[in-house]
Amino acid sequence: MPKEGKKLQEARKQFDKNTLYEPLEALEMVKKTATAKFDETVEVAFRLGVDPRHADQQLRGAVVLPHGTGKTKTVLVFAKGDKAKEAEAAGADFVGAEDMLEKIQGGWLGFDVAIATPDMMGTVGRLGRVLGPRGLMPNPKTGTVTFEVGDAVRDAKGGKITYRTDKVGIIHAPIGKASFDTQKLAENFKTLADTLVRIKPASAKGTYMKTITVSSTMGPGVRINPNKL
């Protein structure tokens, strides 16, 4: 196991790793311990009482954070005709059809989000091996397969994030930057937490919100009390 750096060791001394903090307090600590020379991303990890081996307990979706993530996303839209024009008008960075398919097959991946109209999925589906492993494949569950391409582009540009349980039932997601005001981080956190509470699977047994940990890119994790949401 790699040895911790001095900065991380010093950061850990600023709080009790065994204490469960209220969200606002935890986020203030994360901001204080974000000492890297770049604007660190603030991330949250929810360990949920779900069993991802069961399809109905595999959580996946998207939510628009009220204050965005602090990252400008490059958006690609697969569409034709009027829908292509709608996507361009909404601010999509790249819009196309078969031409974009060929570009991606040639190795180009200069985008963060891919959106497609349903009629284009026959074409886009051929990119599954390229886009799937990178989390870039358009999917109805995340609102990226839709005829409402204008809304989808605006959401993606305006702070929409996707979430998905991993193999052990943890959801990792960014909720902003360390430079954000604490209150804005707290509101982004609450939006995501409320969404996860709302979509709790009916078949989930026992405690649903098991642990919540928030941290900056290079900082230590601070635990949030799930009962204080």
From Swiss-Prot:
Keyword rRNA-binding appears in the UniProt entry: yes
Cellular component, GO annotation: large ribosomal subunit
Pfam families assigned: Ribosomal_L1
SUPFAM superfamilies assigned: Ribosomal protein L1
GO molecular-function term, one example from the UniProt record: rRNA binding
Protein family: Belongs to the universal ribosomal protein uL1 family.
Key words of the record: Repressor, Ribonucleoprotein, Ribosomal protein, RNA-binding, rRNA-binding, Translation regulation, tRNA-binding
Gene: rplA
GO biological process, one term: translation
Entries under Gene3D superfamilies matching the protein: 3.30.190.20, 3.40.50.790
Subunit structure: Part of the 50S ribosomal subunit.
UniProt name for this protein: Large ribosomal subunit protein uL1
UniProt function note: Binds directly to 23S rRNA. The L1 stalk is quite mobile in the ribosome, and is involved in E site tRNA release. Protein L1 is also a translational repressor protein, it controls the translation of the L11 operon by binding to its mRNA.
Superkingdom as given in the UniProt entry: Bacteria
